[in-house]
Structures are given as C-alpha cells and as structure tokens.
Amino acid sequence: MSQSRPLYEAVTDLPISHAVCLIVVLTLALFAFIRFRSTPNTPPQLKETVPFITNTIGYLTNAGVFIDRVAETLEATKTNIVKFYVGCMPAYIVTGPKNVQFVLNSPGLLDGNFLQLMLMDKHWGLNREEISKFANDKSGRSKVPAKGLATPDDQRYWLGHDRLYAEYLSNRKFSDALADSFCKLFAERLDKHFDEEWATVQLFDVLKTAMAESAIISLFGSKIIDLNPGFVQCYWDFDDIAGTLVWGLPNFLQRKSVAIKDQLHSMTRKHIDSAWEHFDWEGPDRDSAWEPHFGSRLSRETAKWLREKGFSNHAAAGHTLASLFGLNGNTVPVTVWAMIEIIRDAALFQAVSDEALGAFTTDPTNGTRQIDASKLINLPLMQSLYVEIMRLHVSFNVTRKATEPLVVNGYNIEKGALVQTCSQIAHYEEAVWGAEGHPASEFWAWRHIKYVDEVDDCSGETTRRPQFSMKGRPSSFFPYGGGYVMCPGRHFAKQEILLAIAVLVTKFEFEFVEWTNADGSKSDRPPQDDRRFAGFIAMSPDRDARVRLRRLKSE
C-alpha cells in the first residue's frame, strides 16, 4: 500500500508548468472561498462555473445574456441586489425605485465620473496628461465646489464641460436651430430619393443614412462629410463595436475594433484640423447658429474650450467621435423601432399622422409648411410613443464606483466596488409599467396617456382629451442615465426622433412587404433586440423591414 505524501512534495515532483497551474488553481480556490463566504450582510451572488472567470467573460462579451441571468437571480432570490465579480473587483446590480434613486443621487458615495474617464481613454483617445485634468478635478459639477474645495475656476473641467451643453444645447435658441436644421436636411434627403412612384427599400438602411447624415451635418457642419468619403458608413462600423471597446476585452484582443475606431478618429481629426485652418474667428460666423466648418455653435464652442484648456486636436477629434455615438446610437434605432410599430398598425399610423399634422404651421409669405418642434414634442401620443419605445429598447447600465463603504437595501458594499442599475430590468417591471391587457413586456403606444374631462365655459359641453402621463416614476425610467451624470444631448435626441417620425408619417404612404436579414434575404421572423448593444445604448432591431413607400400627392 502506497503512503500519501505531503502536498508540497507532490507539487515539487510535478513538471514546472503543471505545478504553476496547480498553484494558481489552489490560490483561486482559496481566494474564492474567502470572497464567497456568506455573511449576514452579503447579498445573493450570481452563480458561475469558474470563480472570477465565468461571470467576468460573460459580463465583458455577452451583456445581454448576462443581464438575463441577473434578472433571473433577482426573481429567484426575491431580492433587489445581486453580487458578482468582474475579475477580482466586486460588483453589484441593484433594482427597485428607492435603490435606483440612491444610486443616481449619491455623488458623495458613488462616483459616476470614472466611466467617462474610461471613455476618454477608449473613445476620445486622450493621453494621460489630458485625462488627469479631469481625473484630478474633484470639485464636482455644481456651481459650488464639492466638499468646500477651493478649486480655481480654470481647473474645474467637469463644470466647464457641462456648461457647454447647458448654454449651447439645452438653451432653446440653439436647440431649436439644431432641430430646424435636422428637419430640413432630413426632408431634403428623402425628397431627393423618393417621389410619388412606389419604391421598395430597407427601412433601417434608409434611416441609417438619411437620419445620421442630417444629424451629423446639423451638429458638426457639412465639411466633415465633404472631407471624408464614406464617413457615415465608417461611423456605423464603429457603432457596432463602440460599447464592447469600452467594457469588453483588452485592446490586444480587439485589434479589428481598435482599427475601426482609429479609422473614424482619423476622419474626425481631418475635420478638426481643417475647421481650425479655415474658420475665421473674427468673421461674421463667429456667433452664428451654424456654419459649414465646425457646424453648430455647440461644436464650435467645444472646440474652442478644449483648445483653451490645453487639449490637443487629437483630443478634440476624439470628443467629436464620442459625440457621434451619443448623437446616432439612440436616435436612429429608436426611430426605426417606432416606425416598425407604426407601419404594421394602420390605426396607430393614422393616429400618429393626425396628431403630427397638428404641429405644422404654414408660412403666410410663401405657403410652405413647417413643423413647430416645441409643439410636436409635447403632443400626448407622440410623447407616449417615444417613452414606450425608449422603455422597451434602450438597455443602459448606469454605473457608479463606491468611494466609501456603504449600505444598499441592508447589504454592505465595500469601497471600490462597482454599483450598477440596469434600465433593461427597471423598464420591464410589471408592477411599475403593467396595465390591464397590456403587460410591461409588450409594446402599447397609449400606455402613457390618460384622459381628462374639459368643460367648455361657453357651451358647458364636456370633452375628453388625451394627456401625456408617464406610467412609471423617473427612478424607474432612465434611458439616458440619471442624477448628476446624464446624457447632455437627450433633449435634442428626443426632438430628432419625433421630428423624423413626423416627417415620415406626414410625407409618405407606407406598405409593409416582409422582414429581412442583414444580407437582404427574407427572414422567417420579425425583428428582436440586437443583444450586442445590451448595457450600452439602444438595441437596434436584428432584422430589417422591407417596405414600399411613396410621397403623398399633397406633398
């Protein structure tokens, strides 16, 4: 009978490669045992086959399936929080309106800037010195510096950057100018390609070009397109990989994705260099709402601010690249989803068209029709349709990092942990969004409308009128993030989406033909969310719609 030997002797007799592997496995097992020991204040943990590896790979490479697993665990454990690890970093996903509100509105405990610092590295292409300008600014985004810090105004980079959007995008004067420009360009592009004869097209393909080009020119000027043949297609190649480039595998394992990003960056750099060379800062366009080189006032003032703060043209080009993702990544897919629902429901098409027509005005001098964007975005069915499509198809993980130990839902969360809340989970909560006959998982255009009685003062007659009323609370609806870190372009995005829908339903007649695959072949099923985009932005339809359209004779 052979005697058992001490473990260290057995290990030393192994080939060195086997010994190293065994030591690594034993170390991981010990680390896992220590980490995964349950304590009274530890939330349920997401199961995995290989500790620290299985969930990490799933989280980084297949966010859609990963979020499904989280949702299943939350349901099975009847809790509002689940723990897992990304590598050796603890991470938590929390749900429930109160917990979401805490995550969104606790800047002193949960840092939302670190994700933007990652974007500055992965998308903008800033160097370390440039990133450190933002990273070292701990003063926050409010007018009064955080924690009483006496940070000089010229070093308050977060506040300065946010002010650009507040002054030149949220401001009604500039947002209306952008909306008018987009609407005009979009209508022109459609009129150029379609007349009163029937044409058969792929809906997503048409909007990918017409919407994206119109929005890009409105924000960044026409020169960015003129200087870069194939620019729009290059953007959509980047759109496919933008999310995983930030959260996915290391760059050396994503060489193709990095090459796509670099190609788009070289195009935006060519645009920035040309704009600085040819724009006359002392000329009449200095304060204009739009000109062809930089485009909008926002784009021009951003380029100026970046240069004044010591950022390179390479950094400014990266800022443009990142803005393109924010500009088109939500608006085009959301519009496509909305049009898919509208085209396949004749009653909805008629209702949306009738309501949109009420936002048109006629110029008394030349008889041309124009859309009143501010009126359009406040129409009840338009707003309900917009919220419903955003609710169902935007998958965005709001991400924070714990700067101090804290407690969420009675559970301890350690300093340095990632804390996330998923719109994809919150937006499907039946208790929040469900209505009789219309479960939260299904599209219903009228979900966010209530009817109110109005009495006419003269006749005394009572009329029931529709009124927009979002079904859920803000803490249950956050497609653009929330709290002090939100998408600064969300207001223009809403305008763009609803303007595009209004133009399409009032100018054209549509007939649905069939669903198609990416190669144009017939699909045996309707589109579903493309889960590659889960966790990052709006999920595009994974199928296209082949439709026939023609311009209405009244047009």
Language-model regions: role of each:
Residues S299-E355, Q420, G489, I497:
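Central I-helix of cytochrome P450 enzymes
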Residues C422-Q467:
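Conserved cytochrome P450 K-helix/beta-meander segment immediately N-terminal to the heme-binding cysteine loop
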